[in-house]
Swiss-Prot record:
Main location: cytoplasm
Protein task: Catalyzes the condensation of (S)-aspartate-beta-semialdehyde [(S)-ASA] and pyruvate to 4-hydroxy-tetrahydrodipicolinate (HTPA).
Keywords: Amino-acid biosynthesis, Cytoplasm, Diaminopimelate biosynthesis, Lyase, Lysine biosynthesis, Schiff base
GO BP terms, alphabetized: diaminopimelate biosynthetic process; lysine biosynthetic process via diaminopimelate
GN (gene name): dapA
Protein name from the UniProt record: 4-hydroxy-tetrahydrodipicolinate synthase
Chain positions of site Part of a proton relay during catalysis: 44, 107
Length: 292
C-alpha cells in the first residue's frame, strides 16, 4: 500500500508567519513531477508542533486538494494524550487522506502496554490505514519490536516508520509482524540499506529537495538493482547527513528556499533560521549532490 520514496513534506510560511499555500502547491506539483510515491503532510518535518489544530487540518486538506489524486497524501498525527490523538484522527477522517502517520506519545514516556492501548484506541476510530511512527530520539520512548508485532495484528495498522536507525530491527520486525506489514525507514542515511534488508521504502527529509533522485534510488532498490541505487545514495550521503546539522527541518527549509522551491525559509519559533556558520556546509552538500 505504501512504498518507495515518500516525502516528509515541509510546511512553507509567509514572512508574517502564515502558511504559504502558493508555495505549498508548488511543492506538491514538484513531487508529482519528480515521481515521489506519496506525501506526508504536517509530520515532524512539516512543523506539526507549531501549527494550531485548525491550521494542521487545513494544510492536510489543501495538500490533498493540490494533489488532485495524482499521489496519496498521508496525514501526520499524534499526541501525548490518547484522547487528543483520537480527536485529531476524527478531524482528519474526511479530508481525503490515504493514511495516518501517528507518532508515539512524547514526553510522558508510556510503557509498552500503554503504547499498545494508545494505538489500538486510534485504530478503532477509523477505517483509514494507520502507520506507526517510532522516533525515540525525539519522543523519549522506544516502541519495541514485540509491541509493533502485537499492533500489526490490528486490521488497519498497516505499516511502521522506523526512525531509530537500528538496522537490526528490520529482520526482527519482518520475522515478528504479520505478513504484508510494511516497513518504512525514517532515516535517510540508512534508508537504502533498510530496503536492502527487507524494507519497502523511506519517509524522507532529503526527498524535499532531491525528489527525483530519491524516487529513482528507491525504485531501483525495490527492483533489486542495489548497485545502481547505491551510486545515487553515495552522491546524496553528505546531504543526508548535513540536513541534520541543526534541528530538522531547519537545514532543509533553508535549502528549499535557496533552490527556489519555496518563497522563503522561515520557521516558527522556537525553531530558527539556519545559522550563518552552517549555511556553507549545507550549500556544499547541495553541490556534492549535484542538485543545485
Amino acid at each position: 500500500m505504501f512504498s518507495g520514496s515518500i516525502v516528509a513534506l515541509i510546511t512553507p510560511f509567509t514572512p508574517d508567519g502564515e502558511v504559504d499555500y502558493i508555495s505549498l502547491k508548488k511543492l506538491v506539483d514538484f513531487h508529482v513531477d519528480a515521481g515521489t510515491d506519496a506525501i506526508v503532510s504536517v509530520g515532524t518535518t512539516g512543523e506539526s508542533a507549531t501549527l494550531t489544530v485548525e491550521e494542521h487540518v487545513k494544510v492536510v486538506a489543501k495538500t490533498v486538494e493540490f494533489a488532485e489524486g495524482r499521489l496519496p497524501i498521508i496525514a501526520g498525527t499524534g499526541a501525548n494524550a490518547t484522547h487528543e490523538a483520537v480527536t485529531f484522527s476524527r478531524l482528519l477522517n474526511n479530508t481525503g487522506i490515504a493514511g495516518y502517520l501517528s507518532v508515539t506519545p512524547y514526553y510522558n514516556k508510556p510503557t509498552q502496554e500503554g503504547l499498545f492501548l494508545h494505538y489500538n484506541a486510534i485504530a478503532q476510530e477509523t477505517d483509514i490505514p494507520v502507520i506507526l511512527y517510532n522516533v525515540p530520539g525525539r519522543t523519549a520512548v522506544d516502541m519495541r519490536p514485540e509491541t509493533v508485532a502485537r499492533l500489526s495484528e490490528i486490521k488497519n495498522i498497516v505499516a511502521l516508520k522506523d526512525a531509530t536507525g537500528d538496522l537490526s530491527r528490520v529482520a526482527k520486525h519482518r520475522e515478528m509482524c504479520k505478513e504484508g506489514f510494511v516497513l518504512l525507514s525514517g532515516d535517510d542515511a540508512t534508508g537504502l540499506e533498510f530496503v536492502k534488508l527487507g524494507g519497502q521504502g523511506v519517509i524522507s527529509v532529503t526527498n524535499n529537495i532531491a525528489a527525483a533522485d530519491m524516487a529513482k534510488m528507491m525504485h531501483l532498490a525495490l527492483d533489486g538493482k542495489f548497485d545502481e541505487a547505491a551510486s545515487i545514495n553515495q552522491r546524496l550521503m553528505t546531504l543526508h547527513k548535513n540536513l541534520f546539522i541543526e534541528s530538522s527541518p531547519i537545514p532543509v527549509k533553508w535549502a528549499a528556499h535557496k533552490m527556489g522551491l519555496i518563497a522563503n525559509g522561515d520557521l516558527r519559533l522556537p525553531l530558527t533560521q539556519l545559522s550563518e556558520p552552517a549555511r556553507p556546509i549545507v550549500a556544499q552538500a547541495l553541490s556534492e549532490a549535484c542538485i543545485y
